[in-house]
């Protein structure tokens, strides 16, 4: 049973905003007692309620607000490792249209936009309430501030990756028409990277929170697992700098990666398979995870934003499955994100990651084959009975699989790439770091490492973790990337007739939803078509 419950609890102390449009309700905030906000948010306890509320939207993307937006699926469907699947081509039509680079204002990631702006709004609320806190120590005040600022960067980072040009504000809107200026992608990056550097330079956040052993059991004594940390900030920084191809900050990002590599707090889990087990959550390889909890859950189809588990395993498993040793007959999957055969075939037989990544179901096992079925599914987040057996809520919606967002393996591969791109030798530290990942996978080390080797290793290591598409896009700016690792040459029509359009630079930023355009006529749609 997992014990890290604090950050799986969603409080409603700070009311959410469910649109970024021009409406007075965007600013309405109520507190649990009905007393004036200035009087309520004065104590440390109440300030912490607002902080936990700022974390709450992290749990919403997989299902809520009318769309499924599991973060790894959103990050994989436009890439080259998976098909979209589902019942038909119109099941989650927005995913299918994004997959084929024909999305529009009515078929995009509309609810993800809302989730992220809800998180931003709650972070801004917390930062405002801190000014009212009279019963908060200065140390706690700084700790809460930096958590909120880093969370806010995280939410904006998702918006920046997908939409690029977005409304940007660091204080909630207080005057009609309650709209914010729309920044270009480069402007958003500049604002976020400066904010991120301020958080990092403050050195307020701990490098890591720890899972400890007590009475023979793993426990989280402080209830802190899931909070943002300095290490998580380093990973966001490297991710943003590399996606922007901001060479002026490569050395700084490399320094942050080296700090994590030199720290005794992080190491690769010796077992790649163990990472994906419940006991592997928050292991030494984990840098940051989003917690999902099967016990004490309140999440249901009528209350999708309540505390609970995740629907991800249901989404990505076969329909009407007859059962196996891990998942009983009668449980139901929905057939999204079947793995491409070519993805399975890219692993060598010696690669220990293959059978942990790929759930291959024998052809004689009968289940309801849905659209684009390949009999190969993502093993990392596949459903198991043990991951919902203590759930009191709707079963399909309450698996307890944490979402592994940043792993130490990514730190090593980030460092290898950044070293090479700042003039490092392919036989030096970059080789050491990349080969550490390969050795864990049971593969021979490389004698000389190139940037393209790192990109290829990233593909093998992170299948199904939502990173491949963004690697392909950013590799457009990497001179040493091969055709198989660049979006313009890898994301092209396939031989099966599923993808009929090619990726172009116009497809980097997806369309803004029509509802957002209607709520603010000043918003300019991305030039996607």
Regions of interest found by a model, annotated:
Residues 1-20:
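Sec-dependent bacterial lipoprotein signal peptides
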Residues 92, 98, 339-407:
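Flexible, polar/acidic helix-loop-strand segments at domain edges
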Residues 158-162, 167, 243-247, 421-424:
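Short coil/turn linking the two alpha-helices of tandem helical-hairpin repeats
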Residues 44-52, 56-66, 85-163, 179, ...:
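Conserved, well-structured interaction surfaces
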Residues 23-89, 189, 193-205, 209-213, ...:
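An aromatic- and glycine-enriched ligand-binding surface/loop that stacks and positions planar moieties
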